[in-house]
From Swiss-Prot:
Function: Probable toxic component of a putative type VII toxin-antitoxin (TA) system, probably an RNase. Probably neutralized by cognate antitoxin YutD.
PANTHER family given in the database record: RNASE YUTE-RELATED, UPF0331 PROTEIN YUTE
Keyword set, alphabetical order: Hydrolase, Nuclease, Toxin-antitoxin system
Higher taxonomy: Bacteria, Bacillati, Bacillota, Bacilli, Bacillales
GO molecular function, one term: RNA nuclease activity
The protein's name: Putative RNase YutE
Broad class of enzyme this protein falls into: hydrolase
Annotated organism of origin: Bacillus subtilis (strain 168)
A GO cellular component annotation in the UniProt record: toxin-antitoxin complex
Documented EC number(s): 3.1.-.-
Organism domain of life: Bacteria
Active site: 96
Length: 144
């Protein structure tokens, strides 16, 4: 029996999609506020990927991850995301350390290019999660 909190995962995915929409709606990140907003959006996208990955791993009793990269490796191994998507998302996840621990070194231009370069994988991530949930658990029901 799986203990997957679909409601929590769906809230996280909705928040993720909102952050991605905010990224897409902005055309100028050059101001100081713009750069800080971009860094926050990038950080939140990464956290949503990791939180959703951990929720999937815990809920479906997959093997325990040993690192952030390993979360993506497990999602690839379990066929939640494709290998290409996993590799692309890992490139963005690798920037987490800079955003969280080495924030003085954060380069908004580099982060912008990373998000743009892997935007398809980012857009597909919620679809892949939802598809896997429906395949494994069936359609969402109004009853809990």
């Amino acid at each position: 029996m799986y203990f997957v909190d679909r409601s929590k995962i769906e809230k996280t995915l909705g928040f993720f999609e909102h952050q991605l929409a905010l990224f897409d709606s902005q055309t100028d990140w050059q101001s100081e506020i713009g750069e800080l907003a971009l860094q926050r959006i990038g950080h939140l996208l990464i956290e949503c990927i990791l939180d959703t990955g951990n929720d999937m791993i815990d809920g479906f009793i997959m093997r325990d991850p040993g690192s952030y990269d390993d979360i993506m490796d497990i999602l690839v191994d379990e066929k939640v995301v494709t290998e290409k998507e996993g590799d692309e998302l890992k490139k963005l996840i690798a920037y987490r350390k800079t955003l969280v621990q080495q924030y003085l070194l954060a380069d908004s231009g580099e982060l912008y290019r990373l998000i743009k370069a892997h935007q398809t994988a980012l857009q597909d991530f919620p679809k892949r999660i939802r598809s896997y949930l429906e395949t494994e658990l069936g359609p969402v029901s109004a009853f809990k």
